[in-house]
From Swiss-Prot:
Keywords: Hydrolase, Lipid A biosynthesis, Lipid biosynthesis, Lipid metabolism, Metal-binding, Zinc
The protein's name in its UniProt record: UDP-3-O-acyl-N-acetylglucosamine deacetylase
EC nos: 3.5.1.108
Family (UniProt): Belongs to the LpxC family.
Active-site residues from the entry: 264
Gene name in the database record: lpxC
Pathway the protein contributes to: Glycolipid biosynthesis; lipid IV(A) biosynthesis; lipid IV(A) from (3R)-3-hydroxytetradecanoyl-[acyl-carrier-protein] and UDP-N-acetyl-alpha-D-glucosamine: step 2/6
GO molecular function per UniProt: metal ion binding; UDP-3-O-acyl-N-acetylglucosamine deacetylase activity
């Protein structure tokens, strides 16, 4: 039996403080309750600068390394970890007030966001939000990378990563997910990166907030971190990213996701593809303001 979902917000505002991954500077984020139908909206406030950026597919302006939302003048980077926590809680209406151009990295997972939002209490509205159950296979492809979505009455993910590293060669997982399983098995998984890449980025003034406190760091043949939260934490984090990205569609998209070496670009392409195929809207409706709709080869059945 398919679940009936209701629009939700938080009961009280909650403040979240952390550092930006790239700037290394303090970021203040406040989540505010919002009326039913508001959607998820970032409110950027920095001195006299103000901007309102809705979380929607047409506002995705970059998918390199992280997912970035923008309005043509302003942008908010690295939104996916926060959005994954919002998705897991079923929240549909929030104002996210922020004083920087990137969401704080926290511990590199979605867990701090989940805990903060849960502490604010959850309010359920009478209005229903309808999940999307795909009726036909859909896929997006970029060379040897792909993301497939198959019809299924349950949310399920089969994900494989295949980096040129002894610990990440063919790391994979198949998992059936409900909201509680996502909270326990996916949201605690931290982002990961390679030491050589971190050093190169920091030499360019980027990733200044990156550390062992907020990322899994891999050396040539091992981990710098003393302990992992899961044996396959890295591939679990890719699922976290997937749901943070897919949630930008504005409706839960249910099916069996099959991913191999996918990432933010394919995640967003799939969300656009699903929304276009389900609503009957022209795919151009979801075209982002600054980047082409698909830089990827796309096939639809």
């Amino acid at each position: 039996m398919k679940e009936i979902l209701y629009r939700k917000s938080i009961q009280d505002r909650v403040r979240i403080k952390g550092i930006g991954l790239h700037s290394g500077k303090e970021v203040n984020l406040t989540a505010h309750p919002a009326p039913s139908g508001t959607g998820i909206v970032f409110e950027y406030r920095k001195g006299l600068e103000k901007a309102s950026i809705s979380v929607e597919l047409s506002n995705v302006v970059d998918t390199s390394n992280a997912t970035t939302l923008g309005d043509g003048l302003h942008k908010i980077q690295t939104v996916e970890h926060l959005l994954a926590a919002i998705y897991a809680l079923g929240l549909t209406d929030l104002i996210l007030e922020i004083d920087a151009v990137e969401v704080p990295i926290m511990d590199g997972s979605s867990l701090p966001f989940l805990q903060a939002l849960e502490s604010a209490g959850i309010v359920k509205y009478p209005e229903i939000i309808e999940p999307i159950y795909v009726q036909n296979p859909l896929w997006v492809v970029d060379g040897d990378k792909y993301l497939v979505l198959l019809p299924s009455d349950e949310l399920k993910v089969t994900y494989t990563i295949d980096f040129n590293h002894p610990l990440l060669k063919g790391q994979n997982i198949t998992i059936s997910l409900d909201k509680e399983t996502i909270k326990q098995e996916i949201l605690p998984a931290r982002t990961f990166g390679f030491l050589k890449d971190v050093e190169a980025l920091q030499a360019k003034g980027l990733a200044m907030g990156g550390s062992l406190d907020n990322a899994i760091v891999l050396t040539q043949d091992g981990y710098l971190n003393q302990q992992l939260r899961f044996e396959n934490e890295c591939v679990r984090h890719k699922i976290l990213d997937l749901f943070g990205d897919i949630s930008i569609a504005g409706r839960p998209i249910i099916g069996h996701y099959l991913a191999s070496k996918a990432g933010h670009a394919l995640d967003i392409s799939m969300a656009k593809l699903v929304m276009s195929s389900v609503t009957g809207d022209e795919i151009s409706k979801y075209k982002s303001r600054r980047i082409p709709l698909f830089k990827r080869k796309v096939a639809v059945v």
